[in-house]
């Protein structure tokens, strides 16, 4: 069992550009940018304990993840996180469907990943906003906040699925946040 420890902030486009400059100045390692499609499922056992099953498709590969919230009052999110690579995402989706799990939330994301000061810093663009997440252990997260001068930024307590439910488009039982064709090209 793994544990995800992270802090998230909502930022604007000017702050995104400043963060890239601060990351470069701090000697951060750029790990590249990717486009993701994230599908979260509803079904048996997920309604209790804030549990999530997610199938993420990224650049021709897929990752299947189980997440479960853990109690914490520090302002840093902690969640159980178990994930595995999937060879055939379509087959897994069929298996989940056969077991009674159905897609409930879908969101697309452009993610730029950096490594600095012992943490992973990601700059995320979703159809409804720009965000930065810092993931690692608690002390290095706080150190990275200071190094990158984002400790005064507005924290975002909601998860991307929660934000998708607020800002996405309802399509029957499914809520989606997808880029338009024009947004995908930019």
Identify the function of each model-found stretch:
Residues 16, 141-142:
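Short, well-ordered alpha-helical microsegments
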